[in-house]
Swiss-Prot record:
Residues modified as Phosphoserine: S168
Cellular localization per UniProt: Endoplasmic reticulum membrane
Record text on subunit structure and interactions: Interacts with CYBB; CYBC1 may act as a chaperone stabilizing Cytochrome b-245 heterodimer.
Cellular-component GO terms for this entry: endoplasmic reticulum; endoplasmic reticulum membrane
Spans through the membrane: 20-42
Protein name, entry field: Cytochrome b-245 chaperone 1
Described function: Functions as a chaperone necessary for a stable expression of the CYBA and CYBB subunits of the cytochrome b-245 heterodimer. Controls the phagocyte respiratory burst and is essential for innate immunity.
One matching Pfam family: Cybc1_Eros
Species this chain originates from: Bos taurus
Key word Cell wall biogenesis/degradation present: no
Predominant localisation class: endoplasmic reticulum
């Protein structure tokens, strides 16, 4: 699953994502290698601790991040939060949280993009496109599986932000007037 809907009201959409089964399985597998190496080796206690600690470090490094997206119409903002256990351990609890805040009015489109996933092939991610031309992924990592799972989330966001509605004739005439008044058209 790409993201889960935590809450959905007319003014607030809260989406969450936690590490998946593949990520947790990899953590348990790598940590098991370290524990087995420590248990079956005839080395000193220091080396055994090194085996377990090293494998724990590699296992946590491969763990996916916890991510959430909060679209709030009452504040007019979207908050994208990311929590990384790996960064939290590296900085000794000083970092680990990333947060991006964007105005809802700046979002112009929501797309699904295909991304190459190392070792596994291709995955899909929802991308928010802004009026400035800048784009930002909804999550930091793509999800493997069916594109339709990711498209459901993209459609949910598009519907919530009412981006699917066509421009009114007044907005169309204003945009064509502003194009005609551009400085390059003057003679």
């Amino acid at each position: 699953m790409y993201m889960q809907v935590e809450t959905r009201t007319s003014s607030r959409l809260h989406l969450k994502r936690a590490p998946g089964i593949r990520s947790w399985s990899l953590l348990v597998g790598i940590l098991s290698i370290g524990l087995a190496a420590a248990y079956y080796s005839g080395d000193s206690l220091g080396w055994k601790l090194f085996y377990v600690t090293g494998c724990l470090f590699v296992a946590v490094q491969n763990l996916e991040d916890w991510e959430e997206a909060i679209f709030n119409k009452s504040t007019g903002k979207v908050v994208l939060k990311t929590f990384s256990l790996y960064r939290k351990l590296l900085t000794l609890c000083r970092a680990g949280h990333d947060q991006v805040v964007v105005l809802l009015s700046d979002i112009r489109d929501v797309n699904v993009e295909e991304e190459k996933v190392r070792y596994f092939g291709k995955g899909y991610v929802v991308v928010l496109r802004f009026a400035t031309g800048f784009s930002h992924p909804l999550t930091q990592s793509a999800v493997m599986g069916h594109r339709s799972d990711v498209e459901v989330i993209a459609k949910l966001i598009t519907t919530f932000l009412e981006l699917h509605r066509l421009e009114s004739p007044v907005e169309l005439s204003q945009s064509s007037d502003s194009e005609a008044d551009s400085p390059g058209d003057q003679s």
